[in-house]
């Protein structure tokens, strides 16, 4: 069914336009693409009037084409249409074109009652005379969806969802400047699908070029949707799904769009999204991709379980828990490993990812977050045992720093740093491990702040409480310890632990630079970006996993700057405490979190084990706790091999 604002008296003229539409090659391109498994056909149209697009879509539907993208733009008296239809099988769908809000809402409600789901929505005009175009499909996989039009503020959409997790399928901004309206469509987010949506408002307009740069600085991220307002403000949506090669173009005239479609066709890339603005001299935004739909994810397990009487049962149980968690939380990469007396008895690596991502191996290294602190505590243990330090050593005087802003700083001891009682409270002030860029800006410094400079900065600030009177978790404590260790030993902290702590285990610095991580098989997944701490003068944002969080991992190595495999962590626990100084301590654990990683290490009665993910952006902290303290941790259920 096609519903239109056109009167029935115009029906005959609409139907007679089929040949007229075909006579405007600049406004449509019917394309055939060669594929390894055959060919597919696609129709891209733009600049069509209501009668033209009605005739076009009726014929396309009759010929087996389905909607990939649909857009209405221009004035209400001269609305234009752009769209992409692809020849393929699929669920039943219905389309509406050029309807006012009353007609559109009635159509939407009627089809929703019949089990249809809104998949495309577009609007043009003002709040009182807006015209709408849309598609509804019978999509069994979408149980719940919410679409709200006529919003004055796009952020009010969250109120309509009543905290129900949604991923945004489409946005249409219409109306005049200072009188803007928004139509937003969301589908229920059942698998923690990650995306970023950048709404444009009159009080906060975002530069699309900068957004494109920053969002695509995250590995595998790309634009998946762009809306154009009549004054050419792009509203983009980005995500980390995979479609092979892709290209994004904006601000194209009709002739430039025609040339771009031809150029991308020559590269075997085809249009997957189109939006327009204006009735005359229209401008277009278009996205091209190698694959029409995102690649499906595949579940892969590598590694072995060798140290139990029922290895197959252990492997099956581990795999089931991890598969359920990773699929529900959209986690792509993970490892679990267990050791007894330093010998690995189980190591499993899990991948829930597209074919363009690496399959995780047991030897791959993940970021450890605060699990890195185990190595700082072990190094401190060495120096305590050798008499080079003691628990009561006053840290700042030992470093030759005797005139702090707060005299209480002189009383901070090694034990205070180990026990998180040194006087630093990250609930009162920002976490010191993540203020490298802030310090540089405060000092008008264009070079990255070193750990020594950070220590000097903190030394010049008042404490939050008297050392020893309270305990608040502190990244700065182990950062200061790592500096103290380097000062005492005369070598870098990294060098010292490799020579004196690791005993050949494969642990290394996790570099901050995105360039140094570009080919890392383990992707530090996050949707967040900001300006890089390692380049304070930069005006380009980067992934928070690459310094956008304000940290420099090279300088914070003693707190959260290392990476290793889960197997390595489980082996290290054979001789070292998980959370304290000294040798192995049963029934203790350490939990680490940093952008792009979540890690857990625990010593039980006989088993030492570790679990690591390549993201911390899962559904909730409760889900994480249910994972690490749930069945995956119940190693006592399985008898060890004799």
UniProtKB/Swiss-Prot annotation:
It is found in: Secreted. GO terms for biological process: effector-mediated suppression of host defense response. It catalyses: a glycyl-glycyl-[protein] + H2O = N-terminal glycyl-[protein] + [protein]-C-terminal glycine. Gene3D superfamilies: DD-peptidase/beta-lactamase superfamily. It comes from the Eukaryota. Disulfide bonds join 149-183. This is Polyglycine hydrolase. It comes from Epicoccum sorghinum.
């Amino acid at each position: 069914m096609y519903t239109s604002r056109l009167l029935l008296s115009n029906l005959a003229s609409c139907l007679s336009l089929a040949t007229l539409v075909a006579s405007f090659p600049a406004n449509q391109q019917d394309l055939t693409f060669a594929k390894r498994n055959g060919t597919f056909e696609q129709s891209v149209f733009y600049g069509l009037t209501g009668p033209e697009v009605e005739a076009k879509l009726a014929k396309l539907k009759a010929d087996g084409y389905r909607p990939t993208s649909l857009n209405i733009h221009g004035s209400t008296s001269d609305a234009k249409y752009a769209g992409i239809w692809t020849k393929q099988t699929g669920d039943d769908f219905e389309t509406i074109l050029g309807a006012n809000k009353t007609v559109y809402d009635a159509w939407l409600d009627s089809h929703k009652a019949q089990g249809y789901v809104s998949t495309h929505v577009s609007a043009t005009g003002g709040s009182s005379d807006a015209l709408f175009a849309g598609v509804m499909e019978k999509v069994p996989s979408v149980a719940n969806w919410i679409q709200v039009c006529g919003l004055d503020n796009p952020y009010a959409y969250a109120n309509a969802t009543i905290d129900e997790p949604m991923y945004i399928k489409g946005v249409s901004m219409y109306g005049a400047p200072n009188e803007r309206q928004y139509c937003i469509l969301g589908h229920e987010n059942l698998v923690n699908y990650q995306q970023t949506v950048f709404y444009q408002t009159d009080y906060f307009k975002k530069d699309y070029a900068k957004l494109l740069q920053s969002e695509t600085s995250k590995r595998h991220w790309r634009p998946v949707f762009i809306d154009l307002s009549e004054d050419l403000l792009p509203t983009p949506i980005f995500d980390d799904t995979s479609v092979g090669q892709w290209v994004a173009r904006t601000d194209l005239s009709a002739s430039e769009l025609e040339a771009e479609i031809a150029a991308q066709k020559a590269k075997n890339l085809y249009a997957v999204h189109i939006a327009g603005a204006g009735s005359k001299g229209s401008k277009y935004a278009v996205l091209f991709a190698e694959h029409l739909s995102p690649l499906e994810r595949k579940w892969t397990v590598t590694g072995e379980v060798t140290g139990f009487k029922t290895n197959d049962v252990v492997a099956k149980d581990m795999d089931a828990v991890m598969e359920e968690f990773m699929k529900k939380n959209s986690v792509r990469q993970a490892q679990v490993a267990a050791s007894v007396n330093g010998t690995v008895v189980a190591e499993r690596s899990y991948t829930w990812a597209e074919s363009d991502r690496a399959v995780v191996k047991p030897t791959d290294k993940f970021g450890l977050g605060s699990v890195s602190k185990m190595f700082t505590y072990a190094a401190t243990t060495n120096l305590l045992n050798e008499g080079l330090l003691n628990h009561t050593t006053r840290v700042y005087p030992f470093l030759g720093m005797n005139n702090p802003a707060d005299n209480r700083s002189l009383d901070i001891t090694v034990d205070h740093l180990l026990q998180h009682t040194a006087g630093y409270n990250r609930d009162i002030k920002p976490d010191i491990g993540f203020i490298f860029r802030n310090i540089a800006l405060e000092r008008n410094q264009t070079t990255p702040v070193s750990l020594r400079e950070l220590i000097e900065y903190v030394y010049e600030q008042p404490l939050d409480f008297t050392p020893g009177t309270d305990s608040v978790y502190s990244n700065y404590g182990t950062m200061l310890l790592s500096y103290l260790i380097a000062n005492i030993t005369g070598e870098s902290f990294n060098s010292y632990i490799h020579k004196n702590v690791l005993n050949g285990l494969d642990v290394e610095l996790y570099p901050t630079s995105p360039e140094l991580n570009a080919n890392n098989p383990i992707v530090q997944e996050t949707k967040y970006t900001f300006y890089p701490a390692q380049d304070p003068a930069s005006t380009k944002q980067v992934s928070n996993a690459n310094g956008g969080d304000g940290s420099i991992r090279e300088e914070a190595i003693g707190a959260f700057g290392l990476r290793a495999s889960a197997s390595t962590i489980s082996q290290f626990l054979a001789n070292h405490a998980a959370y304290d100084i000294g040798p192995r301590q049963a029934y203790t654990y350490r939990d680490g979190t940093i952008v792009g990683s979540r890690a857990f290490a625990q010593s039980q009665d006989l088993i030492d084990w570790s679990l690591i993910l390549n993201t911390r952006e899962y559904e909730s902290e409760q889900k994480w706790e249910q994972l690490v303290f749930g069945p995956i941790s119940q190693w006592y259920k399985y008898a060890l091999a004799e």
